[in-house]
């Protein structure tokens, strides 16, 4: 039986004139894997839409920003769009001003163009407007980005992602 992959773990959600890749980016190992994978892909430029990690402290957002900066040149990074996803997260995941500021300071300090948004739909729209033929759009971040791929697909007039279930053999082994 073919394993469909794990949703939001280096998931290709759209392939057309450009590609959309979605990843939860939940820890440093995950971020390393994302950027290592991306640098091996064939694309023209990279645009990242990143959900800031709300109520996880400044350090969590600084870690993500540092991984982005380290990968920027090799990954041909064109711009970063960050979002608080205010209307798409629970109270416990609300991004604090200092979390956004910490992330932004590192990205901007490296000379990478960055735009901050409060809402996920605005960030996704801006991400789609920022890509061209051959580009890669990376949707990155935990729960506040969960709806990101489906929003992008809707804006591209594409059907939503199929809900992926784990194969029965994996469920039985747990």
What role is predicted for each listed range?
Residues 2-174:
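ATP-dependent carboxylate-amine ligase
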């Amino acid at each position: 039986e073919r394993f469909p992959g794990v949703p939001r773990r280096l998931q290709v959600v759209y392939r057309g004139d450009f590609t959309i890749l979605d990843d939860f980016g939940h820890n440093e190992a995950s971020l390393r894997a994302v950027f290592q994978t991306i640098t091996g892909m064939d694309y023209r430029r990279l645009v990242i839409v990143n959900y800031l990690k709300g109520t996880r402290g400044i350090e969590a957002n600084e870690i993500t920003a540092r991984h982005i900066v380290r990968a920027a040149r090799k990954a041909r990074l064109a711009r970063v769009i960050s979002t608080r996803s205010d209307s798409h997260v629970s109270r416990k995941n609300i991004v604090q001003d200092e979390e956004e500021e910490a992330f932004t300071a590192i990205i901007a300090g490296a000379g990478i163009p960055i735009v901050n948004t409060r809402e996920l739909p605005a960030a996704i729209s801006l991400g789609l407007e920022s890509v061209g033929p051959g580009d890669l759009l990376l949707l990155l971040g935990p729960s506040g980005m969960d709806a990101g791929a489906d929003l992008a697909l809707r804006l591209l007039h594409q059907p939503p992602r199929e809900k992926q279930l784990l194969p029965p053999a994996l469920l039985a082994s747990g």
